Amino acid sequence: MSNGSVPVSGIGGRGDGEGSSQVHMESTGGMDRAKVFAVYGKGGIGKSTTSSNLAVAFSQLGKRVLQIGCDPKHDSTFTLTKRLVPTVIDSLEEVDFHMEELRPEDYVYEGYNGVLCVEAGGPPAGTGCGGYVVGQTVKLLKQHHLLEETDVVIFDVLGDVVCGGFAAPLQHADQALIVTANDFDSIFAMNRIAGAIQAKAKNYKVRLGGVIANRSERTDQIDRINERIGLRTLAHVPNYDVVRRSRLHKSTLFELEEQSEELERVRDEYLSLAAALWNGVDPLSPSPLKDREVFDLLGFD
């Protein structure tokens, strides 16, 4: 099937792992088969672009991949599916929020190269709690064993919010990845995200995997903060125009028909990143700085 909802085997109702602060789940068992990554970063930094291209890179390596968009804008997976797919909240509304009536094919869609796509969605702007929807989505995915029946799960998480339901992916992830650019605002957010992830790591298995430098020709400021707090850059995607064009084509970089040195380089970067993450990168335990320390550290002499 292409770009449509897909049936997934193994529907069942079993205990859940702990989700958001609003959702009680009982067990995190049964997810050992999949490598689970949570992607965070400053709003607008390119997390969805990064997540979708990384998902395809994993699929190019022969892995079964599930990408979960955790933003009310529900635009994480459109380059994979070529459309804004119905969200989990849309599907729940159709069954009057009786979660037990949903089937995987009601909210799971197949995208490019077989990547499975889910969009959590959220309430209308200014109402409700988007984080709660993320927590409920995690619960639903576990009930239907979707976090077990894949090789790789990628959570693409809203902005730099690491609280409540938006922290639910961290409670199920093996590693968190932070997308940043070589600028003050992105790095400032990165430092705060690293602190939040470290706090979660005290009670959950999640560890920081590293940093993905995005939309940046240079990485000197990223390198400076990495050295200071104990992070590392796993991949570097320069600010190539081919990335912008791929979004306008509603396409991942791997589907573009054009040929260019820039395109080949960025494809290779994602494939190398996927291979490194699959083979395993050493977990990090950074020591984030206080906000004023970041302010004093960054910039030019």
Swiss-Prot record:
| UniProt cross-references to Pfam families, sorted A to Z | Fer4_NifH
Query: Reaction catalysed?
Result: chlorophyllide a + oxidized 2[4Fe-4S]-[ferredoxin] + 2 ADP + 2 phosphate = protochlorophyllide a + reduced 2[4Fe-4S]-[ferredoxin] + 2 ATP + 2 H2O
UniProt-listed InterPro entries = NifH/chlL_CS (IPR030655), NifH/frxC (IPR000392), P-loop_NTPase (IPR027417), Protochlorophyllide_ATP-bd (IPR005971)
Binding-site residues for ATP, renumbered to this chain = G44, I45, G46, K47, S48, T49, K73, N214, R215
Q: Which UniProt keywords apply?
A: 4Fe-4S, ATP-binding, Bacteriochlorophyll biosynthesis, Chlorophyll biosynthesis, Iron, Iron-sulfur, Magnesium, Metal-binding, Nucleotide-binding, Oxidoreductase, Photosynthesis
Q: Where is this region: Disordered?
A: 1-26
Q: Which cofactor does it need?
A: [4Fe-4S] cluster
Stored PANTHER family: LIGHT-INDEPENDENT PROTOCHLOROPHYLLIDE REDUCTASE IRON-SULFUR ATP-BINDING PROTEIN
Its assembly, as annotated, is: Homodimer. Protochlorophyllide reductase is composed of three subunits; BchL, BchN and BchB.
Task performed by this protein = Component of the dark-operative protochlorophyllide reductase (DPOR) that uses Mg-ATP and reduced ferredoxin to reduce ring D of protochlorophyllide (Pchlide) to form chlorophyllide a (Chlide). This reaction is light-independent. The L component serves as a unique electron donor to the NB-component of the complex, and binds Mg-ATP.
What name is this protein filed under?
Answer: Light-independent protochlorophyllide reductase iron-sulfur ATP-binding protein
Tell me the organism: Halorhodospira halophila (strain DSM 244 / SL1) (Ectothiorhodospira halophila (strain DSM 244 / SL1))
Q: Which gene encodes it?
A: bchL
